[in-house]
């Protein structure tokens, strides 16, 4: 139905767009005369290459096109010039050599505008002083190592309750994917808001709906110059409706925090405890943010923390468990390591997680094969430049296919094989300097929440491996991906836990 609606709109707009297409073709011809655009597949009138991106996962389709046209491609998605990078060398050009030229996000994606409270968040705000101030706040106060460590007791408590709940269902087939997702949301909710409340379940539901709605294709994004398309876009109104409900809950949470802001903070182990909303409101009160930090900005940042932090962590834990079920030798090796390190304690806490070198390799390998956001987030070229002799037009959307790069046979031995051992002696890390490995992006807009995400991945995985052996009632797991900005498995993971005899969660 959606496809026919798309064709209907394309037909109605044919005459109007054809004149613009002809004009733009004339403008683009200057590149063929003087500068050469990167290679790419043939285009058709109006749609450009948009029709080639239907019928499958976009990151798969782009990888296959790159095999034919090269690691630096030019596509036309409607009227939008789009550059696709599919190799470490091209990624380095974007994230390092020309980093500042690719530091912007597209400013004409309506869905981004709505959920980011008019581009006022950390993720999609325009590159400039405001973004630098937000980045400073996130790196120094919200998501710093010190801040993440301050939530250690929350993580340990939530994960232990999670383990007890699973232990009570021994021998019963459980939806582990759902349990993991609820756990990560629970940790993030307490870190952000201080406690779970009556709105938590509804908040999670709306956030999930928003994330899925943003990922849906919107014809208006293909023709940003045709403003009236937004007026007839069902996608826009769907996102706005969900976002208004989401905003009501966040507004209520902010109001509650403001009412208690002058009250003494809770005490734990002799230390004052602030949640992330407290931190943001304190910055707002101090007024030391160069640009005004209003409630709208705070709400946008809250959306970032949940949409990015929870999805990345829960998706990675889920994929890691799936891969270990498929590869029992890996599972056994990871279990032996964590049980050896924490044998005396009888339970896993964060004190010795750094000793779990093999588990860290499992996480790295999971992120190589299954980066949560396989195409990262799009960037926009701020001014015309050259990459490998090709012209990159100003205002082009730029996509880096991190999924394809992580499976590049020129850089990875047996790239389709799940083999954590490859990382045991490797210096490749998450920091964006290893361009063959970019699960969190790179350059100055690399994900600021890496530390927060990893903390929510390591402890749950270690506990699941320590306390239980796992049985799958399915001969062959479905490893197909779902659709969306964040790529989960198509099916939830159902497993049967068997309590490990030496474990005794207190």
From Swiss-Prot:
UniProt entry tagged with the keyword Transcription: no
SUPFAM superfamilies listed in its UniProt record: Cytochrome P450
Pathway: Alkaloid biosynthesis; vindoline biosynthesis
PROSITE patterns according to UniProt: CYTOCHROME_P450 (PS00086)
Catalytic reaction equation(s): (-)-tabersonine + reduced [NADPH--hemoprotein reductase] + O2 = 16-hydroxytabersonine + oxidized [NADPH--hemoprotein reductase] + H2O + H(+)
GO molecular function: heme binding; iron ion binding; tabersonine 16-hydroxylase activity
Topology in the lipid bilayer: Single-pass membrane protein
Enzyme class label: oxidoreductase
Keywords: Alkaloid metabolism, Endoplasmic reticulum, Heme, Iron, Membrane, Metal-binding, Monooxygenase, Oxidoreductase, Transmembrane, Transmembrane helix
GO BP annotation list: alkaloid metabolic process
Activity's dependence on pH: Optimum pH is 7.5 in phosphate buffer and 8.0 in TRIS-HCl.
Tissue: Predominantly expressed in young leaves of mature plants. Low expression in roots and flowers, but not detected in stems and old leaves. Found predominantly in leaf epidermis. Barely detected in roots, internodes, young and mature leaves, and flower buds, but relatively abundant in fully developed flowers. Not detected in leaf epidermal cells.
Induction: Up-regulated by methyl jasmonate. Inhibited by cytochrome c, CO, clotrimazole, miconazole, tricliphane, flusilazole and tetcyclasis, and with a lower efficiency, by 1-phenylimidazole and piperonylbutoxide. Not inhibited by potassium cyanide and sodium azide.
Transmembrane annotation, as ranges: 1-21
Requisite cofactors: heme
Keyword Zinc: no
Coiled coil: none
Pfam families per UniProt: p450
Binding site for heme: 447
Function summary: Involved in the flower biosynthesis of vindoline, a precursor of vinblastine and vincristine. Hydroxylates specifically tabersonine, 2,3-dihydrotabersonine and 2,3-dihydro-3-hydroxytabersonine, but has no activity with naringenin, tryptamine, secologanin, strictosidine, ajmalicine, vindoline and catharanthine.
Family named by the database record: Belongs to the cytochrome P450 family.
Extra remark: Tabersonine 16-hydroxylation is orchestrated in an organ-dependent manner by two genes including CYP71D351, which encodes the T16H2 isoform acting in the foliar vindoline biosynthesis, and CYP71D12, which encodes the T16H1 isoform acting in the flower vindoline biosynthesis.
Name listed for the protein in its UniProt record: Tabersonine 16-hydroxylase 1
Organism: Catharanthus roseus
Gene name of the record: CYP71D12
């Amino acid at each position: 139905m959606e496809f026919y609606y798309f064709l209907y709109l394309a037909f109605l707009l044919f005459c109007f767009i054809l004149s613009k297409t002809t004009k733009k073709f004339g403008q683009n011809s200057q590149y063929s005369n003087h500068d050469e655009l990167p290679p790419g597949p043939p285009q058709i009138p109006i749609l450009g290459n948009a029709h080639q991106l239907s019928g499958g996962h976009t990151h798969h389709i782009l990888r296959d096109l790159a095999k034919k046209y090269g690691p630096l491609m030019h596509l036309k998605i409607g009227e939008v010039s789009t550059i696709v990078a599919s190799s470490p060398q091209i990624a380095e050009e974007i994230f390092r050599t020309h980093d500042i030229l690719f530091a912007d996000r597209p400013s004409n994606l309506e869905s981004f505008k709505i959920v980011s409270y008019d581009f006022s968040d950390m993720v999609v705000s325009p590159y400039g002083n405001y973004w630098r101030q937000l980045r400073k706040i996130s790196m120094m106060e919200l998501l710093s190592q010190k801040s993440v460590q301050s939530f250690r007791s929350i993580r340990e408590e939530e994960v232990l309750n999670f383990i007890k709940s699973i232990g009570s269902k021994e021998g019963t087939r459980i939806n582990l994917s759902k349990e993991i997702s609820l756990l990560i949301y629970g940790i993030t909710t307490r870190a952000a808001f201080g406690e779970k409340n009556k709105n938590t379940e509804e908040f999670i539901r709306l956030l999930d709906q928003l994330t899925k709605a943003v990922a849906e294709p919107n014809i208006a994004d293909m023709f940003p110059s045709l403003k009236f398309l937004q007026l007839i876009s069902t996608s826009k109104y769907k996102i706005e409706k969900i976002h208004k409900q989401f905003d009501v809950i966040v507004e209520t949470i902010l109001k509650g925090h403001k009412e208690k802001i002058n009250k003494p903070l809770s005490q734990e182990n002799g230390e004052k405890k602030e949640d992330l909303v407290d931190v943001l409101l304190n910055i707002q009160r101090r007024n030391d943010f160069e640009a005004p930090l209003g409630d709208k900005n705070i709400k946008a940042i809250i959306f970032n923390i949940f949409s990015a932090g929870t999805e990345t962590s829960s998706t990675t834990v889920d994929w890691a468990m799936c891969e270990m079920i498929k590869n029992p030798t890996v599972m056994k090796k990871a279990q032996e390591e964590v049980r050896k390190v924490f044998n005396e304690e009888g339970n896993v806490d964060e004190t010795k997680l750094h000793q779990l070198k093999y588990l860290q390799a499992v996480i790295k390998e999971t992120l190589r094969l299954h980066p949560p956001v396989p195409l990262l987030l799009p960037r926009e070229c701020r001014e015309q430049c050259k990459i490998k002799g090709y012209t990159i037009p100003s205002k082009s959307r730029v996509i880096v296919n991190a999924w394809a790069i992580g499976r590049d046979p020129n850089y990875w031995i047996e790239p389709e094989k799940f083999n954590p051992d490859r990382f045991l002696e490797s210096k490749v890390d998450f920091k964006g300097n290893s361009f063959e490995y970019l699960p969190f992006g790179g350059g100055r807009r690399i994900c600021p929440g890496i530390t927060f995400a990893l903390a929510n991945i390591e402890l749950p995985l270690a506990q699941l491996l320590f306390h239980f052996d796992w049985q799958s009632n399915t001969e062959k797991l479905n490893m197909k991906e779902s659709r969306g900005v964040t790529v989960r498995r198509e099916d939830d993971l159902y497993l049967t836990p068997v309590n490990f005899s030496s474990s005794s969660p207190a």
